[in-house]
Swiss-Prot record:
The lineage of its organism: Viruses, Varidnaviria, Bamfordvirae, Nucleocytoviricota, Pokkesviricetes. Gene3D superfamilies: Ankyrin repeat-containing domain (1.25.40.20). PANTHER family: ANKYRIN REPEAT FAMILY PROTEIN, PROTEASOME 26S SUBUNIT, NON-ATPASE 10. Coiled coil: none annotated. This is Putative ankyrin repeat protein FPV240. ANK repeats lie at residues 33-62, 66-95, 100-129, 133-162, 166-195, 200-229. Keywords: ANK repeat, Early protein, Repeat. It comes from the Viruses. InterPro entries: Ankyrin_rpt (IPR002110), Ankyrin_rpt-contain_sf (IPR036770), PRANC_domain (IPR018272).
Amino acid sequence: MDRVELCNAILFGELDVARRLLDSYINPNFTINGYSPIKMAVRLRDVEMIKLLMSYNTYPDYNYPDIESELHEAVEEGDVVKVEELLDSGKFINDVIYKKGNTPLHLATISKNLDMMRLLIARGADTDVPNTDRFTPLHLAVMSKDIKGIELLLDHRACTNIEDCYGCTPLIIAMSKGDTEVCRMLLDSGANIDYFSKRPCVTAMCYAIQNNKIDMVSMFLKRGADSNIVFTVMNEEHTTLEMICNMDTNPESESVDMLIADIALRQYTNTISSDKGFSRNMTVINSKSRLKDVFEKCKIELRRINSESIRTYNILDLCLKPSKNLDENILARHSRKILGLYDNAIFYKYLLKELADTASQRAEAIESAMRVIDEKITGDETKWNWLPHEIKYNILEYIGNKELDIASMK
């Protein structure tokens, strides 16, 4: 009876009813009068129903072992003209009745055929249809580090938070491959940095800390990953720190120290999102002498950073609120102070890095250009070398880094 009800829900486009039935563990891989649920959805060209069914372990090729499709085969062959002709003749562009449940867009992504991907998307291919393994085209592009393909899919609003059959989002896949560039692209396009996958029971941050991927942890923290967020696993609540300490992980890794540093930072700046999460984290920290020592050292380092100011802004505030960042010339004039804090920082280098890079690059560009100009202008026709150092510096502050570099090379 439930099977008939599912078929009726598909027939009438009742997504909520179909989802309720699938949640009650109905196996969608059956046929009635030669039609499986997925074949019905494809026949009706109901893309949302197709996506729903494919996300519940549907195998479109299970009952059709000798399946063939002119459209899919033309895509595999890279035959753009034939694909256009088939689409013009009415072939369904989001058809999953093929090997492994792949749509034409999946196949174009697998072969990294960017022109074919563009064509299919322009003709209405949905970027978020999962295949049998629940891989969307974005999952596949991330797996193969196809930067151009990833950019194309993200430009067309491919969803960044869909789980595959292993419970992994594209962000978790990119993180597991150590691919900082792709992680950045996904985060820029809206990937949820705190997305909790129930199947592997991890977030991207948890995975990064577990594998001590320092660059990833640094980027996630800078992007706002929440160290005090509470997740529910098997009806039990956990924070990232609790999960890490429950895994086969070295609790003395640099990545764990960075997590502790973020917990201390959120307390210091009064930006705790969850009192419950913070309380649970502090219970763990206070139970381990080394973690407690790290936490106390973090507070000392934060006080030191917060005690230093540039004009009316303390440096910690400048690091935390980029909108308040000062003009790069002002930062350059205080580069020694900023670089001194950066060099002496143990736990908060990731926080100071952008400020330190901006200050040092600008200061070096001005000083380097001044040295070159001083050496090249030896006569007194311009009176350049008569000017005090401060006046020269003020003049060069009006010139951008790129132009200063060009001037230095001439």
